[in-house]
Amino acid sequence: EAGEECDCGAPENPCCDAATCKLRPGAQCAEGLCCDQCRFKGAGKICRRARGDNPDDRCTGQSADCPRNRFY
């Protein structure tokens, strides 16, 4: 929703403050295939294995989202 940085949920979420729906201090992300322990996974980390002859999808290091490669 508008103004939220992360989905409010359980209070014990280490990345997201359930009261404010904002990322906790030092957190870059709260969820996503390219988010690991509240931080973006490094550029080039595989986030989705390829099917067929297409290459694997890899994290950019700048987002928690796993971008689809251009070959699909």
UniProtKB/Swiss-Prot annotation:
The UniProt entry, under SUPFAM superfamilies, shows: Blood coagulation inhibitor (disintegrin)
- Recorded superkingdom: Eukaryota
* Key word Secreted present: yes
**What Pfam families would the database entry show?**
Disintegrin
Q: Which residues form the Disintegrin domain?
A: 1-72
Cysteines engaged in disulfide bonds, as pairs: 6-21, 8-16, 15-38, 29-35, 34-59, 47-66
Specify where the region named Disordered lies, as residue ranges: 52-72
Please tell me in which tissues this protein is expressed. Answer: Expressed by the venom gland.
Instruction: Give the principal location in a single coarse category.
Output: secreted
Compartments where found? Secreted
Q: Which InterPro entries match?
A: Disintegrin_CS (IPR018358), Disintegrin_dom (IPR001762), Disintegrin_dom_sf (IPR036436)
Q: Name one GO molecular function term.
A: toxin activity
Tell me the protein family, please.
Belongs to the venom metalloproteinase (M12B) family. P-II subfamily. P-IIa sub-subfamily.
Task of the protein: Inhibits fibrinogen interaction with platelets. Acts by binding to the glycoprotein IIb-IIIa receptor (ITGA2B/ITGB3) on the platelet surface and inhibits aggregation induced by ADP, thrombin, platelet-activating factor and collagen. Also inhibits T24 and SK-Mel-28 cell adhesion to fibronectin with IC(50) of 4.4 uM and 33 nM, respectively.
Record's miscellaneous remark? The name colombistatin has been given to this protein due to its source species B.colombiensis, which is a synonym of B.atrox.
Assembly behavior: Monomer.
Q: What is this protein called?
A: Disintegrin batroxostatin
**Organism source for this protein?**
Bothrops atrox (Barba amarilla)
